[in-house]
Amino acid sequence: MINLNSRTIGILSTSLGAMLIGVAPILVRMSEISPSLTGFYRFLVATFILFIYGIAKNKFINLKFKDILVLAIPGIFFGSDITLWHWSINQTSVANAALFVNTAPIYVAIISYFLFKDKLDMFFYFAGLCCLGGVFLILFEQNEYQTFTGDLLSLVAAVFYSGYLISVKKFSETYETFHLMFFSALFGCIPLYLGSLLEIGQ
């Protein structure tokens, strides 16, 4: 029997998650409903499944209203990220949308440096400059306005995604993983629903 430590499990889980994220934009492009509504139903189904699990495991006991407000923050960030990202997928190439939204770690490092005084080494500066340099080369190579807009949307989505990652990291010191997942899915529905209303109005 193979014994896996927590670090190995974390790396494997992250790798699997990255592969699934890689498939997500393709499925969004194939969806027959609007981009935001596609994301809304994704979050709604996740909320429903997590709610059933939470009830079965008594996960909602001792939660205060203040806790729910705090836990809403990652959800708003995540829902805003997905709303903008889904819009970008329909306005630029799937490859560009996936590439630009994954510049989030650059923003995470920069924001963490200013907010939490996390140290950045020279390798980060070099890698970050290479990454952003590549992004700008791709951006300004575009000839079509719609494609350029889609690329910008995915870059803004990355900023919201970094907000989600930072808030989850910070709040994981106080709250259970389940609570972070459930309320991220629940409150993530809000910006996605608002986004779908905007799409109806167009």
Feature-to-residue mapping (PLM):
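Loop-to-transmembrane alpha-helix entry segments
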Residues: F65, A98-V101, K117-L137, E144-L153
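Hydrophobic transmembrane alpha-helices of multi-pass small-molecule transport proteins
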Residues: L50, G54, A72, L120-F140, ...
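C-terminal transmembrane-helix exit sites in multi-pass transporters
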Residues: I52-N58, A104-F126, Q142
